[in-house]
């Protein structure tokens, strides 16, 4: 299913849903960041997805990272809450979703990199190389906040 992101765009569709979702900022022992290239829009992002009924939010993080990348993680902490009503995602099925995303830092504890139906590429990326990837500005904000380990409190916005 295709997706178009609108960010403070007057031509954006009106949102008709809000789905709690997560993304995971995962760094390996070399300090590289786990990134996925999404199959729905071709952009690079942190792995993540929607929260399912019956799950704790930490379980959602673990499941989504495993599903999209093959990597097993342990959730460390919350780096931010992202609820910008000016960020709307339109999907091919007519859904127009307002952003509602929790970003968690997580540690890899096992697994082997692989793609999924939601990812065309999965790789560990040196932080110095992140600027060369096509990353949506709201995802870049999450990455920047998660990389700032000196933040005393999570981002709320």
Ranges and model annotations:
Residues 42-43, 112-157:
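Nudix hydrolase/Nudix homology domain
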Residues 72-82:
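A short coil-to-beta-strand element that immediately follows conserved catalytic motifs
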Residues 28, 32-68:
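Conserved Nudix-box catalytic region and its N-terminal flanking loop in Nudix hydrolases
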Residues 84-112:
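Active-site-adjacent beta-strand/loop module that shapes the phosphate/pyrophosphate-binding cleft
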Residues 1-23, 94:
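Acidic, metal-coordinating catalytic segment for phosphate/diphosphate chemistry
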Residues 19, 39-41, 46, 73, ...:
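Short connector loops at helix/strand junctions that flank enzyme active sites
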